[in-house]
Amino acid sequence: MAKSYLITGGAGFIGLTFTKLMLRETDARITVLDKLTYASHPEEMEKLKQNSRFRFVKGDISVQEDIDRAFDETYDGVIHFAAESHVDRSISQAEPFITTNVMGTYRLAEAVLKGKAKKLIHISTDEVYGDLKADDPAFTETTPLSPNNPYSASKASSDLLVLSYVKTHKLPAIITRCSNNYGPYQHSEKMIPTIIRHAKQGLPVPLYGDGLQIRDWLFAEDHCRAIKLILEKGTDGEVYNIGGGNERTNKELASVILKHLGCEELFAHVEDRKGHDRRYAINASKLKNELGWRQEVTFEEGIARTIQWYTDNDR
């Protein structure tokens, strides 16, 4: 019998990528619960409704009535992407991040605890670990949590909440923490879409501070394949890091994109973000050694595909 999954935030960047992957590569029935924020893709939800294995429920994970509507059946798993995720927005207005990321996760954990689903996959971020110095080893799953902004603090809070349910209630849950993602469907406010947009308009690319902050980049589809593998083979109660092993400074990243587009290197250094972490790097050896995950898309191929998508979709 085909399995049935609930995907929260399935109209957003990574959630949509995962939803399409599951519909394409499995025979599972998929329900997406999404409140359709500014960063979502409602037009893609309409297209997916043509698939008889797909169902869309508009709702907010922090609202119990919406949770009840979505959990009108028992699922084989809940894959929880839904989150407020933009750091700058969290600095200026933290409340939506607490409401969605913490309270929403609580409501989902309660639903799974009550038997509405067999498993919870909680999608988190490497930002919960804080930042690294240039010569520090990459984050592992046992690195202490040390968030430096309201967004990462809200995600760390939700991680700890899920882990507390695992220890206290034996909740069947797994946490994943991934490095920076890029690819089609990412909202225009994010870094790579911003670089592409400015380059195409002949404008200087804005860089926070000196532009030498380091991030580890992973193509979103590779991230989603890792989540699918963890859903199928991961161990309940565990945390799995997912990373690209592709560290680049923000300035180096911008240079790669500008070169690909044939544009002159024009940068505008702007005031640095409050609480801006200097370096992220993920050690994904646990995922690779225990479950056999390997990324399939090189950085060069992923960037080319991403630029092509934004060119085709005029974003």
From Swiss-Prot:
GO MF, any single term: dTDP-glucose 4,6-dehydratase activity
Required cofactor(s): NAD(+)
Catalytic residue positions: 126-127, 151
GO annotation terms (biological process): nucleotide-sugar metabolic process
Pathway(s) annotated for this protein in UniProt: Spore coat biogenesis; spore coat polysaccharide biosynthesis
InterPro entries, sorted: dTDP_Gluc_deHydtase, NAD(P)-bd_dom, NAD(P)-bd_dom_sf
Keyword Lyase assigned: yes
Binding, substrate: 85, 125, 180, 190-191, 206-208, 215, 250, 272-276
Sequence positions that bind NAD(+): 13-14, 34-37, 60-61, 81-85, 100, 151-155, 181
UniProt-listed Enzyme Commission number(s): 4.2.1.46
Residue pairs linked by disulfide bridges in the UniProt entry: none
Record keywords: Lyase, NAD
Cofactor, how bound (note): Binds 1 NAD(+) per subunit.
Assembly behavior: Homodimer.
Family the UniProt entry places it in: Belongs to the NAD(P)-dependent epimerase/dehydratase family. dTDP-glucose dehydratase subfamily.
Name used for this protein in its record: dTDP-glucose 4,6-dehydratase
Organism name: Bacillus subtilis (strain 168)
